Design a protein with these regions (language model features):
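Signature of dsDNA virion morphogenesis modules
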Residues: 1-191
């Protein structure tokens, strides 16, 4: 089966992640955890924080896909692409863009924390995760009662990114074509000057 590396096309303004979707079955096969505040004061439990934490992208994780021609293949993102995607997500002010199952736009959802796992002592381990180096981890504040209820019922379990990426192989073909066209232009120009 074909394996395709997806990259960010830096010449394309639309390339990158537009939103984070909360989904029942995340393609990266990593569920988030719901963080709650459990401080007990005078025998009272404080209100829930309503924060979800989990992986947004895991580098080199093969993700199964099937296109409209019924062709099956896997995609993956390199560590470099994961880092670029996480940076562009915030540079383009997309931290308040969220959807449910990639269909319904959601209000009251914000990515409030984000980092790239850099080693074996990453803080995500404090929450029971064991992500590989280069994983983009996010924490999302949920001020949406409907979604928070879905979290508590186990109807949404993880994050899934939404965005536009280029196929590295197809991009290399485009670059080869551009090089060939430039060589042809150069030959034509040289012939015209002679």
């Amino acid at each position: 089966m074909r394996i395709v590396e997806l990259i960010i096309d830096e010449k394309d303004e639309t390339s990158g992640i537009d939103a984070v979707s909360v989904v029942e079955s995340p393609a990266i096969e990593s569920d988030f955890i719901a963080l709650k505040k459990h401080e007990i004061e005078l025998k009272e439990v404080d209100a829930e924080k309503r924060i979800l934490m989990g992986a947004a992208l895991i580098p080199n994780k093969q993700i199964y896909r099937k296109n409209d021609k019924n062709e099956e293949y896997y995609i993956y993102f390199s560590e470099e692409t994961v880092r670029k995607a996480s940076e562009l997500f915030f540079m383009n002010s997309n931290q308040n863009n969220a959807t449910l199952e990639h269909k319904q736009k959601l209000d009251g959802m914000s990515v409030v924390e984000s980092w790239i796992v850099e080693g074996s002592h990453d803080k995500s381990m404090n929450y029971g995760f064991n992500f590989p180096k280069g994983t983009w981890v996010i924490s999302m504040k949920v001020n949406n009662d409907e979604i928070w209820n879905k979290v508590k019922l186990g109807e949404v379990k993880g994050f899934s990114i939404e965005g536009y990426f280029a196929d590295k192989y197809e991009m290399s073909l485009v670059n080869e074509d551009e090089i060939l066209i430039d060589k042809i232009k150069q030959i034509i120009t040289e012939n015209e000057n002679n």
